[in-house]
């Protein structure tokens, strides 16, 4: 699940406000309460899956988190997408509150040799549907 950067179909403001703080990485109860709102898909109503995801996340620092947010605010790939000539797999979740599905369509329409694959899941489909995603990637690469 990705977007062209700054010029994208944005998430709902309530989602963006929840992303504005790294609190979810430090407070598992808070993460449990908002994960479905931010990530959608399989994380909606599945505290076990949220806790499983958190066991694999390594927290670094508030500084690093805010730098990552800042990087997303000032860059876009839109002007260069038409220059990509190589075959490109664009994967997008149908229930991704953070990066709405429309962004996948935008990428696929602007990249010359793109293939859009729709995943019936949320933002973290590479984690929640790892085998299915890996199969799609392997098929694309072969």
Segments (PLM) and residue ranges:
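Flexible "cap/lid" loop of the alpha/beta hydrolase fold
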Residues: 1-23
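Short beta-strand/loop motif that positions the catalytic acidic residue
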Residues: 84, 90-92, 96
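Residue-level signal for the nucleotide or nucleotide-sugar donor/cofactor binding architecture
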Residues: 60, 99, 128
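Conserved alpha/beta-hydrolase catalytic His-Asp/Glu region
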Residues: 27-75, 79-80
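Short alpha-helix in the alpha/beta-hydrolase fold that links the catalytic acid
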Residues: 86, 100-109
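Acidic catalytic loop of the alpha/beta-hydrolase fold
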Residues: 95-99, 124
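Catalytic active-site module of serine/aspartate enzymes centered on a nucleophile-bearing elbow/loop
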Residues: 114-142
């Amino acid at each position: 699940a990705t977007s062209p950067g700054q010029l994208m179909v944005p998430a709902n403001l309530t989602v963006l406000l929840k992303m504005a703080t790294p609190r979810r990485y430090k407070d598992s109860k808070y993460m449990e309460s908002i994960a479905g709102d931010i990530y959608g898909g399989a994380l909606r109503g599945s505290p076990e899956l949220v806790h499983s995801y958190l066991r694999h996340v390594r927290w670094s620092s508030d500084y690093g988190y805010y730098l990552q947010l800042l990087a997303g605010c000032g860059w876009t790939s839109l002007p260069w997408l038409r220059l990509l000539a190589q075959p490109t797999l664009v994967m997008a979740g149908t229930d991704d509150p953070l990066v709405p599905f429309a962004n996948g369509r935008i990428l696929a329409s602007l990249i010359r040799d793109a293939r859009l694959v729709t995943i019936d899941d949320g933002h973290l489909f590479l984690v929640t549907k790892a085998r299915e995603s890996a199969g799609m990637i392997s098929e694309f690469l072969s």
